[in-house]
Swiss-Prot record:
It is an enzyme of class 2 (transferase). InterPro entries: SAM-dependent_MTases_sf, UbiG_MeTrfase. Its EC number is 2.1.1.222, 2.1.1.64. O-methyltransferase that catalyzes the 2 O-methylation steps in the ubiquinone biosynthetic pathway. It catalyses: a 3-demethylubiquinol + S-adenosyl-L-methionine = a ubiquinol + S-adenosyl-L-homocysteine + H(+); a 3-(all-trans-polyprenyl)benzene-1,2-diol + S-adenosyl-L-methionine = a 2-methoxy-6-(all-trans-polyprenyl)phenol + S-adenosyl-L-homocysteine + H(+). The gene is ubiG. This is Ubiquinone biosynthesis O-methyltransferase. It comes from the Bacteria. The keyword S-adenosyl-L-methionine applies. Keywords: Methyltransferase, S-adenosyl-L-methionine, Transferase, Ubiquinone biosynthesis. Belongs to the methyltransferase superfamily. UbiG/COQ3 family. Pathway: Cofactor biosynthesis; ubiquinone biosynthesis. GO terms for molecular function: 2-polyprenyl-6-hydroxyphenol methylase activity; 3-demethylubiquinol 3-O-methyltransferase activity; polyprenyldihydroxybenzoate methyltransferase activity.
Length: 233
């Protein structure tokens, strides 16, 4: 299996996996951001009836949200514990999602051009070779299919907000959640997409108000941002 993965990163999320669906846990920011990213994805591609792959699905927050919107969803991850939590939560939600323990690269080798929509959210900044993941996501999308990414920009403001602010001042995330050196500039992600045969459709920032604790779409891509790309062909 091509595992383009940092074992320490996989272990970090495995250790917290049992708290994935607790909205007051370390995953609180994911719970707060999920409705926004779900609406954004659905608004761009129309999830109902689509065959969707969620890369780096973790405990299944986004996967279940997309299944709830009528998509036929598969989720892949390299954390067995996170996938166990995701599968267990299906009993509570009554939804259907096919979860598999595999990497994007390994799945791409056996599932080329299989999906109408591929999502890879809050994951690229946690792998050693993000360009490889982007390429794998592109491989798995059907020609004309939609591919979505979200990650963190790499600049001083992103360091202040996503690392110093979120991890040390506001305690929104456990310390060590993010490695600033792995943050990705929009220009870099755009280049990865072009090299993988993807055409950039839309770029949107996300901002967080610590007072109202609400995330909102924004033109400001300095910290969190999302990309919608389309597979050429």
């Amino acid at each position: 299996m091509n595992t383009n993965a940092d074992p320490a990163e996989v272990q970090k999320f495995s250790d917290l996996a049992h708290r994935w669906w607790d909205p007051a846990s370390e995953f609180k920011p994911l719970h707060e951001i999920n409705p926004l990213r779900l609406d954004w994805i659905d608004g761009h591609c129309g999830l109902a009836g689509k065959k969707v792959l969620d890369v780096g699905c973790g405990g299944g927050l986004l996967s279940e949200g997309m299944a709830q919107r009528g998509a036929e969803v598969s989720g892949i991850d390299l954390s067995e514990k996170a996938l166990g939590v995701a599968r267990l939560h299906l009993y509570e939600s009554g939804l259907q999602v096919d979860y598999q323990l595999t990497s994007a690269e390994a799945h791409a080798a056996t599932h080329p051009a299989q999906f109408d929509v591929v999502t890879c959210m809050e994951m690229l900044e946690h792998v050693p070779n993000p360009e490889s993941t982007v390429h794998a996501c592109a491989q798995m999308a059907k020609p004309g299919g939609a591919v979505f990414f979200s990650t963190l920009n790499r600049n001083f403001k992103a360091y202040l907000f996503a690392v110093v602010g979120a991890e040390y001042l506001l305690n929104l995330l456990p310390r060590g959640t993010h490695d600033y050196a792995k943050f990705i500039k929009p220009s870099e992600l755009s280049r990865y997409c072009r090299n993988a045969g993807l055409e950039l459709v839309s770029l949107s920032g996300m901002t967080y108000n610590p007072i109202t604790k609400v995330y909102a779409l924004s033109r400001d891509t300095d910290v969190n941002y999302m990309v919608h790309a389309r597979k050429l062909g």
